[in-house]
Amino acid sequence: MKNKGAKQKLKRKGAASAFGCDLTEYLESSGQDVPYVLKSCAEFIETHGIVDGIYRLSGVTSNIQRLRQEFGSDQCPDLTREVYLQDIHCVGSLCKLYFRELPNPLLTYELYEKFTEAVSHCPEEGQLARIQNVIQELPPSHYRTLEYLIRHLAHIASFSSKTNMHARNLALVWAPNLLRSKEIEATGCNGDAAFLAVRVQQVVIEFILNHVDQIFNNGAPGSLENDENRPIMKSLTLPALSLPMKLVSLEEAQARSLATNHPARKERRENSLPEIVPPMGTLFHTVLELPDNKRKLSSKSKKWKSIFNLGRSGSDSKSKLSRNGSVFVRGQRLSVEKATIRPAKSMDSLCSVPVEGKETKGNFNRTVTTGGFFIPATKMHSTGTGSSCDLTKQEGEWGQEGMPPGAEGGFDVSSDRSHLQGAQARPPPEQLKVFRPVEDPESEQTAPKMLGMFYTSNDSPSKSVFTSSLFQMEPSPRNQRKALNISEPFAVSVPLRVSAVISTNSTPCRTPPKELQSLSSLEEFSFHGSESGGWPEEEKPLGAETSAASVPKKAGLEDAKAVPEAPGTVECSKGLSQEPGAHLEEKKTPESSLSSQHLNELEKRPNPEKVVEEGREAGEMESSTLQESPRARAEAVLLHEMDEDDLANALIWPEIQQELKIIESEEELSSLPPPALKTSPIQPILESSLGPFIPSEPPGSLPCGSFPAPVSTPLEVWTRDPANQSTQGASTAASREKPEPEQGLHPDLASLAPLEIVPFEKASPQATVEVGGPGNLSPPLPPAPPPPTPLEESTPVLLSKGGPEREDSSRKLRTDLYIDQLKSQDSPEISSLCQGEEATPRHSDKQNSKNAASEGKGCGFPSPTREVEIVSQEEEDVTHSVQEPSDCDEDDTVTDIAQHGLEMVEPWEEPQWVTSPLHSPTLKDAHKAQVQGLQGHQLEKRLSHRPSLRQSHSLDSKPTVKSQWTLEVPSSSSCANLETERNSDPLQPQAPRREITGWDEKALRSFREFSGLKGAEAPPNQKGPSGVQPNPAETSPISLAEGKELGTHLGHSSPQIRQGGVPGPESSKESSPSVQDSTSPGEHPAKLQLKSTECGPPKGKNRPSSLNLDPAIPIADLFWFENVASFSSPGMQVSEPGDPKVTWMTSSYCKADPWRVYSQDPQDLDIVAHALTGRRNSAPVSVSAVRTSFMVKMCQARAVPVIPPKIQYTQIPQPLPSQSSGENGVQPLERSQEGPSSTSGTTQKPAKDDSPSSLESSKEEKPKQDPGAIKSSPVDATAPCMCEGPTLSPEPGSSNLLSTQDAVVQCRKRMSETEPSGDNLLSSKLERPSGGSKPFHRSRPGRPQSLILFSPPFPIMDHLPPSSTVTDSKVLLSPIRSPTQTVSPGLLCGELAENTWVTPEGVTLRNKMTIPKNGQRLETSTSCFYQPQRRSVILDGRSGRQIE
């Protein structure tokens, strides 16, 4: 106070120098330590200002002006006057005004970049040290003032219970007054950039507020200034004591600053300027990039400024949502190109962080800094992608994700993960970033899947759309934006705080625990929502873990799955992204190791490590084989690193990155990108798939998320596998560990029934089946790449070991392996899907179809060689990307091997068996079928995932596999749905495949877990509501049954199954019987035996049998299927995998017979496959499958309600019998029949077939849908989950439903319109009218209103529309898609599912869905828009945000 007089005099002389006067000069002249305005206001507020909203609410302007004048005059205002006591907020406003008017902000311009950079570092300790160092660089006067102010604010924050102004809120209102960026001010970006900047600034201030004691506890201004600062402070203070001194001080200050003679002056000046300047140089060296980016941002901001400024600059809340919708979308379009988006993400992160509970400022900061303004390097690295780069760098996997575009090889922006990033850095990473920050490590881990779901489902649809549109049209962020608008925003916001708002998130959130898990997944990952369907059952027990655990679980699942599948995943990853292929490989290599390790760990737990080891060997061998690209390895390493560090983030981001990558890969896809695409889509798919379904995870984990998911997977597997094994492990570990923890997990698994059911019910069988299924798949892969001796050797070893042992330990191992394979399969599938997706964008039609087929076969194709598979896949898919082959093969091979290239030995030797029947539609399909025959196991293992996807793409090629998986998906509607979402996530084309894969995987897993469920449900699936499960049941049962029954001859059986799986019809049929058997355990065994017997012959030559099993057997199988369908009534309920109840039912069913049924199934599957081959050719089945899928999906949520709907599809009932009676005769029926059981497969098949005969499929889809609707209705519910997933993959939930139909329709359509698929994002909206038109027409004729109504209610549609511009394309198949969507939403959101499950008829559910959906989710509005979206696809496409 002794300075008071001096200050007043000073004021007199300086005339109101307090306001707008340089702080240092003012304090020197006034001789005060801190500004009098601050001191008096702070003291007054601490005494009288502990009121609600202090510092947030503004005082009366006249009072503020009066106070300012008084402070400017000699008199020190008496703040205790009544006028001020009544308007306390004017004092707080004045205090903020003072700092706002400082010429140089309190945290100076020079240090702005340093501050933002400091908080961008992940570890809090690192942040603290950095912030401390930067604060020490502040001029002493600024330092003292900051310390005083921060301590005051921290004190006020302690009264947050009264004021509601906690540290974050205070930081938010104070940050703009304390931190200002010259660049932003100079650019005059008041909108987007400024708003984003506020987010970053808030993080800085909040961090300081939360660490005030640590930061200011040195007692001295700074360590550097510590010694001299005090003297400096004294010298400042002393000179200030006297006016003369003060005056001299001012002059001295200038003179000294020039001469820097005065130690104090020198020190102070040095700190404020010299030191700051050098730091500035350093800072700007780093920051210069940022500024550069910012400038870009600014310039772009200027362009967008009007948009941002419209409602952006001032609307924080809007900004958050907008960020999701508008900023984010803009960010996506621009974000890739402008740093602003990053900030948007940062803001989102900030927003999200609160949701996350501000988990880690590091994380948030990282996001903000890396994602926000701190993207200098990243942004610099890639204009739009740069943002993602930084995040990547920080998150460690952003690089991977961000790199995908052109950074494939050289995007080393993030030097840390730059090589990875280079390959995967992508614009979407921004989203990812936002998401990631939102998700945080744990969440993020799942988030990647969720992202895959949101990003993939939403984003994935958007990415699918992205992958399609973006992939194909990747260059234009517009497409991205378009997809992003709807899906991206969801992806971004949805993760946490918006998740509730966002329909997918909302719905899942609202959804019951099972759905909650889904939600958590959804929340974190759209796909999670998708996965939620599967998860609820699988993960339901972990309801508590839903959000965090769900994500972790998901991650864990992912881990478990990824780990078990790690080799597969790695392989898949590798195969998945060739461009990322290298990355995948790299990832695969480490991941392979990691995966193997985890697998070992996981499988070790579940079973002998040897299988895992074998798998790992195979995986590693494959890894080696697949390590075609060092980058893959590097990525793998990075993945590994990420695994440890950013596993969660990596998981989330990589998927997004991969999605991003996919996007770009798709563009590059033709040659290299296909794998990248594959990776990308796969990641979304994988993640999404993973998220949605455990198998989903492999896709997320494997292909795209290969590194993320796998990394996450391994990590999570380790952490979650044991801990979350019940949840995640339940799914993954359960599947994997199931053998071991099966019983233990089973209770959980009961809830996790889908997953556990199989393991529990068939701990051994499941393991066997899983191993078998996966093994079969896996072997097919090794056979596919017989040349790759490692693979082959690994496979044989695995087979050898797996064969006999597999049955027992292999059962567990198999479970693990299967899961691994599931993962792997899914991965491969996803890989395939991704590949297909990549190809899809590139060769939308051909690739989708062929990629699917190729991939499906590719999995099988690897028989000749990975190249073969790839060739088949890529050739067909992408004309032949060596990378694809590598990718596909890698995926397949590695996956298979990782999955224990089991059984591949036998099937491998029977390549001839794997004839076209499996993929009869295409030579490639045939070839693949052969390969699959050989690789039946691998394929079954791998193909089960990949083939599903593949079939999705090449409807012919892998309908069955898809069917299988689909069945599995139906098994857990949630799973299916989730998977569908996951599938839908990657891309529409890929979506079909991927979704199917995801679904398949999910289905498979679910199925395995649900084996009974599936068995029980599969019949229902076939029958109707249960039909959903039948498909999975069909697939899974076959796989499982095969695995179980064929545990010994898993190699054959699995191949058959897979083969069957590959041929959707066969799978369906087989599944049908399986389902039947499952449904009635007694019958099931008998049937199983029958089937087994039927399958028995083919078992040795499962593939050949299935290939050769012509309509005759397929018909019989169909009859079996029909019977199963009949049985499916009970199973139907089981079929409600989404519901724990169903899961449990399935569980019981599954526990004994499902596997047997599966055993039977393999043959049946083969038969079906054979029949399916023809049927695959018929699009109608696909349509039916789609429709059915849609229904089934609906049914899944409410299996029972679905049955009546099945009747609603009375048109279909006829086909049902027909299908039943003459599956081979009525391939369409078969398809239809399969529609229920093979709906997924069918749908996927149609999806694949669709690509060749997109229109045909579309046309037939409708007719088929009618037949399929009834029979396939339930199944189709599944199929839709799967198919829709693939087709609608863009739309996670809706996508699933739609995906099935759309997948079938759109998938076919996509197959044919695969390019549009790539384009579909944009095109999809347009295509939705066109391509969707046909499905729409079909739907309309079938149940126009029903379907239409359905779609609006489904948030999935929302998800899908936003993220599925591509899906929108599918949405074009609005009617079908709608139903699919309905299913998907059901799956996605248990709540919706419940509401929607009735939808199987398509009407009831839809009506329910519509209302609940609207009420349930914000997306509902989008869903409501959905119909319009379908119609106004363009609207959605051009402004994806519009739907929002």
UniProtKB/Swiss-Prot annotation:
Its main location: other. Residues 722-734, 822-834, 960-977, 1028-1038, 1211-1224, 1234-1245, 1292-1303, 1314-1323 have a biased composition (Polar residues). Residues 777-790 have a biased composition (Pro residues). It is found in: Cell projection, Lamellipodium; Cell junction, Focal adhesion. SMART domains: RhoGAP. Phosphorylation on Thr-789 reduces GAP activity. Residues 600-619, 735-745, 803-817, 839-848, 992-1008, 1246-1265 have a biased composition (Basic and acidic residues). It is linked to Adams-Oliver syndrome 1: A disorder characterized by the congenital absence of skin (aplasia cutis congenita) in combination with transverse limb defects. Aplasia cutis congenita can be located anywhere on the body, but in the vast majority of the cases, it is present on the posterior parietal region where it is often associated with an underlying defect of the parietal bones. Limb abnormalities are typically limb truncation defects affecting the distal phalanges or entire digits (true ectrodactyly). Only rarely, metatarsals/metacarpals or more proximal limb structures are also affected. Functions as a GTPase-activating protein (GAP) for RAC1 and CDC42. Required for cell spreading, polarized lamellipodia formation and cell migration. Interacts with ITSN1, which inhibits GAP activity. Interacts with PARVA. Interacts with GTP-loaded RHOU. This is Rho GTPase-activating protein 31. It comes from Homo sapiens. The lineage of its organism: Eukaryota, Metazoa, Chordata, Craniata, Vertebrata.
